[in-house]
UniProtKB/Swiss-Prot annotation:
Family of the protein in this entry: Belongs to the GPI family.
Xref: Pfam families: PGI
General function of this protein: Promotes the synthesis of starch in leaves.
SUPFAM superfamilies: SIS domain
Source organism: Arabidopsis thaliana (Mouse-ear cress)
Entry keyword DNA repair: no
Descriptive protein name: Glucose-6-phosphate isomerase 1, chloroplastic
Reaction(s) the record says it catalyses: alpha-D-glucose 6-phosphate = beta-D-fructose 6-phosphate
InterPro entries noted in UniProt: G6P_Isomerase, Phosphoglucose_isomerase_CS, SIS_dom_sf, SIS_PGI_1, SIS_PGI_2
Gene: PGI1
Gene Ontology terms describing biological process: gluconeogenesis; glycolytic process; positive regulation of flower development; starch metabolic process
């Protein structure tokens, strides 16, 4: 795999009470805590659920009263906690989060431990103990950090090969074999999860209005969605570069998307291999397939980079570079932010400030949601990107000591000012179960392109007013918020905010003592899905045997379940039958799917070969 050596081939604990009668425990003792003196014993152990309940009662009983209202005091707090990264032009405002100085002091030991853990992670320690892996996405934007010279060389050579390949595609040096345009005009990216969300966010944020190649995504196993993307390409399928992204090559959704696209190529009389690119781990199923079939190029994925942090690897960089986005600037922005977030001073570390505010606002147990509101159309997908980064990293059943903690932080959002006409009504006046994060972009348009709709007011001024007005209206009703401000949306600033949140997630995971870098729940879902498909094959076998009888023997759900030796799966069997019936793959002899008790089904035809398989 030439490209893997750098060449592309052209063949929890709880928040302390505001009255300080309740003190947070260290991370190793989160399953109990002590009450102040009452008529009952002082050291009363509670279950985690009880602890969560008490923490919410103590922390938020007078939350509105505790938030500063005096303008002078608020301005002083704003200045005291205002953070600026001058080189990146990034500001962080946490003045509308009501943490206390005592809380910051109590969190200091945890953060110092988190900073040390992050330092060890960057040096190559096993930061993902459940899978025995290093975690190296920070090395991707500063290869000098890589713990081995071979990794440093691999990172640098891969970046060079991505840029060279992209230049050759854009310039037309590498051409599709059958395109009348004589060059590639479209990208079809096939991947799911981090292999899709990262490239989608970057494309939406940074692609020029008229990119050298336009990009489309197949990010699901929905047949109608796949058909739509292929149909939209139309005759341009002949000039489409298909980028297939899968670490193993065995991810069902990505494999299905690939097979569907290959079918479309065959039906159009096109040679898929001459237009296919694989981004995968060396010697994976996908890598071997691409090598044997002679795909256009192959680029590496690494076992030390997870999907949700892969945006600075070939996963995110290749699609971006093909759209004419300056990926080296994106890496520079990320590297600058990485440097800013290595300081061990909480007050001077923007990622630590975010993690601290998340902990305060959600009691360290995810008791409140994080609503992400980017006031810029091009950043619309940032909330979806953060949804995976935060929730897949922090949503864990067990901590690093094996205790059941059910940690997490729910993330959702929309763009401003669309949110003004959607759910801000509930955020301000409804249930108080969230804190907000505003993403502000100062520059509205490129220099020289702005104009006034009315004297002294531009279109962008209205957007600015909506953001600031919403922030003020929420705070006036006791709703806490964080504001992240960048000068403009550029590859550098996008790289910076990605790196900011990656580091914040890692630090937060450390202070609540969980592994941010594995996803056992996702794997459990994949296993359960595989079991459903295995059951479906048994159902089809039973139905085929009954259909091949003379006369045909329609079966009830109970009979199917019995012959599958799975009476406990009768509900799932019904769902399988209903789905297959809707797609004309089983026929109903009696009843209908709306009446499960009476239904009898059989197949449309007997497959004799399957009887003897």
């Amino acid at each position: 795999m030439a490209s893997l050596s750098g060449l592309y081939s052209s063949s929890p604990s709880l928040k302390p009470a505001k009255n300080h009668s309740f003190k947070a425990l260290p991370a190793q003792s989160r399953d109990s805590f002590s009450f102040p003196h009452t008529s009952k014993p002082t050291n009363l152990p509670l279950t985690l659920s009880s602890a969560r309940s008490v923490a919410r009662d103590i922390s938020h009983a007078d939350s509105k009263k505790e938030l500063l209202k005096d303008p002078d005091a608020l301005w002083k707090r704003y200045l005291d906690w205002f953070y600026q990264q001058k080189e990146l032009g990034l500001y962080l405002d946490i003045s509308r989060v009501g943490f206390t100085d005592e809380f910051v002091a109590e969190m200091e030991p945890r953060f110092q431990a988190a900073f040390k853990a992050m330092e060890d992670l960057e040096k190559g320690s096993i930061a993902n103990p459940d899978e025995g892996r290093m975690v190296g996405h920070y090395w991707l934007r500063n290869s000098k950090l890589a713990p081995k010279p071979t990794l440093k060389t691999l990172i640098e050579n891969t970046l060079d090969s991505i840029c060279a390949f992209s230049d050759d595609i854009i310039s037309g040096k590498i051409k599709p074999p059958s395109s009348p345009e004589g060059r590639f005009t479209q990208i079809l990216s096939v991947g799911i999860g981090g292999s899709a969300l990262g490239p989608q966010f970057v494309a939406e944020a940074l692609a020029p209005d008229n990119p050298p190649l336009k990009i489309r995504f197949i990010d699901n196993t929905d047949p109608a969605g796949i058909d739509h993307q292929i149909a939209q390409l139309g005759p341009e399928l002949a000039s489409t570069l298909v980028v297939v992204i899968s670490k193993s090559g065995g991810t069902p959704e990505t494999r299905n998307g690939l097979l569907e696209v290959q079918k479309a190529f065959r039906e159009a009389g096109l040679n898929f291999a001459k237009q296919g690119v694989a981004i995968t781990q060396e010697n994976s199923l996908l890598d071997n397939t691409a090598r044997i079939e002679g795909w256009l190029a192959r680029f590496p994925m690494y076992d030390w980079v997870g999907g949700r942090t892969s945006i600075m690897s070939a996963v995110g960089l290749l699609p971006a570079a093909l759209q004419g986005i300056n990926v080296r600037e994106m890496l520079t922005g990320a590297a600058l932010m990485d440097e800013a977030t290595r300081t061990t001073s909480i007050k001077n570390n923007p990622a630590a400030l975010l993690a601290m505010c998340w902990y305060w606002a959600s009691n360290g147990v995810g008791s409140k949601d994080m609503v992400v509101l980017p006031y810029k159309d091009s950043l619309l997908l940032f909330s979806r990107y953060l949804q995976q980064l935060v929730m897949e990293s922090l949503g864990k059943e067990f901590d690093l000591d094996g205790n059941t903690v059910n940690q997490g932080l729910t993330v959702y959002g929309n763009k401003g000012s669309t949110d003004q006409h959607a759910y801000i009504q509930q955020l301000r006046d409804g249930v108080h179960n969230f804190f907000a994060t505003f993403i502000e972009v100062l520059r509205d348009r490129p220099p020289g392109h702005d104009w006034e709709l009315e004297p002294g007011v531009t279109c962008g001024d209205y957007l600015f007013g909506m953001l600031q007005g919403t922030r003020s209206a929420l705070y006036a009703n006791g709703r806490e918020s964080i504001s992240v401000t960048i000068q403009e949306v550029t590859p550098t600033s996008v790289g910076a905010i990605i790196a900011l949140y990656e580091r914040a997630v890692g630090l937060y995971a450390s202070i609540v003592n969980i592994n941010a870098y594995h996803q056992p729940g996702v794997e459990a879902g994949k296993k359960a899905a595989a079991e459903v498909l295995a059951l479906q094959k048994r159902v089809l076998s039973v139905l085929n045997e009954a259909t091949c009888k003379d006369p045909v023997e329609p079966l009830t759900l109970e009979e199917i379940a019995d012959r599958c030796h799975a009476p406990e799966e009768i509900e799932m069997i019904y769902k399988i039958i209903a789905h297959m019936s809707a797609n004309d793959r089983v026929l109903i002899a009696e009843g209908n799917c709306g009446s499960p008790r009476s239904i009898k089904v059989y197949l449309g035809e007997c497959n004799v070969d399957d009887l003897y398989a």
